[in-house]
Structure formats: structure tokens, C-alpha cells
Curated annotation (Swiss-Prot):
It comes from the Eukaryota. It comes from Eremothecium gossypii (strain ATCC 10895 / CBS 109.51 / FGSC 9923 / NRRL Y-1056) (Yeast). This is Histone H4.1. Residues 1-20 are annotated as: Disordered. GO terms for molecular function: DNA binding; protein heterodimerization activity; structural constituent of chromatin. The lineage of its organism: Eukaryota, Fungi, Dikarya, Ascomycota, Saccharomycotina. Belongs to the histone H4 family. Its main location: nucleus.
Amino acid sequence: MSGRGKGGKGLGKGGAKRHRKILRDNIQGITKPAIRRLARRGGVKRISGLIYEDVRAVLKSFLESVIRDAVTYTEHAKRKTVTSLDVVYALKRQGRTLYGFGG
């Protein structure tokens, strides 16, 4: 594995390393109308203005735990791509079985 850089597989010189932009405060991308639509789907009629930040915080913690478990499944399988089955198994582990995506 000498001289192959970070990837470890393949031949050739290798391309430029990809750098991801560090994303901060993306939770604000969950807009007020998006939260309102989700609440409507759940049968909510009126929504207090103080709810939106709390919903964002709860959603962030929920997604962090699901993504952490899904990435754990991915790393255990020695893959770099998170599949839908990884997410299904992560949700099942947390007691939220999701049907329709295999598994």
C-alpha cells in the first residue's frame, strides 16, 4: 500500500484531494414554513412562534443519533458510502422501524 496516498486502491498519480467546506448553522436551513408543513401533516392547526427553535434543536439531536448509528454500520462494513439499509438498521436499533427501503 506504499505510495498510494489516502485512497489505497487504484493506480495512477491520483487527483486533487477533495476538501469539504465546513458547514455551520445549517439547522437554519429547516425553515419556518417547512416546520409548519410538517406540523400540518401531523394534524396541528395553530403553531406558537416560540416552537421553531425548539423543533430545530430536537430534529438536530434526532438526526445526529441516527446518522451516528448509520455511519457506524457503514464503517463496520468497511464502506465509505452510507446506504439506505444503514439508515433503516440505525432507525430499527432506536426502535423506529421503517418499512419500504429493504431490510
